[in-house]
């Protein structure tokens, strides 16, 4: 990994460390959210299509989380970031690697995903390496601490681990090339 890629990740981790848990966007008792790798480390915005999709499928008593990870008001999530496919791919590869092997990033996952433990129900739509992020979080969390009602829809998932908790409703959708 190049020096600039490493420094970008260090800057990203410093931003994650500085975020206040009190500013989490995961405050509702029932949440619907996207979780994916990050194609842009400075912004956690969803595309207008992703946000519209969530709003269209959102059950009446659920709240849409209008951000990707880290799901925090203090992290930019409203500005649309334009990223080339090549740069997005490189960023997602970096994210995947750090999810598995960077203990500081794994601690950030715990810190920023742990508000889900307070939710009555969560529906998480994992795109790409989002399933890898989720399985890493759940492994570090321990099965005895699993959120009560967790539903996962994995779209074109990329994950080192298989999500096989009996208490999780899982739907995997993948194309012939996934």
Annotate each predicted stretch with a short phrase.
Residues 2-12, 18-119:
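Active-site catalytic motif of lipid deacylating hydrolases and related acyltransferases
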Residues 6-16, 54, 90, 127, ...:
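Intrinsically disordered, low-complexity regions
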Residues 104-178:
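Serine-dependent carboxylesterase/thioesterase catalytic core
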């Amino acid at each position: 990994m190049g020096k600039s890629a490493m420094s970008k990740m260090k800057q990203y981790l410093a931003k994650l460390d500085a975020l206040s848990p009190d500013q989490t966007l995961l405050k509702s008792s029932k949440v619907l959210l996207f979780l994916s790798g990050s194609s842009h480390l400075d912004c956690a915005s969803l595309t207008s299509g992703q946000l519209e999709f969530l709003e269209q499928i959102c059950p009446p008593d659920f709240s849409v989380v209008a951000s990707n990870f880290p799901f925090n008001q203090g992290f930019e999530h409203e500005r649309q970031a334009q990223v080339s496919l090549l740069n997005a791919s490189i960023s997602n590869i970096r994210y995947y690697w750090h999810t598995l092997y960077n203990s500081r990033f794994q601690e950030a996952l715990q810190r920023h995903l742990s508000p889900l433990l307070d939710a009555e129900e969560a529906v998480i739509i994992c795109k790409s390496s989002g399933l890898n992020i989720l399985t890493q979080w759940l492994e570090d969390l321990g099965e005895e601490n699993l959120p009560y009602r967790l539903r996962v829809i994995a779209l074109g998932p990329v994950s080192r681990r298989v999500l096989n908790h009996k208490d999780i409703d899982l739907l995997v959708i993948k194309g012939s090339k996934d």
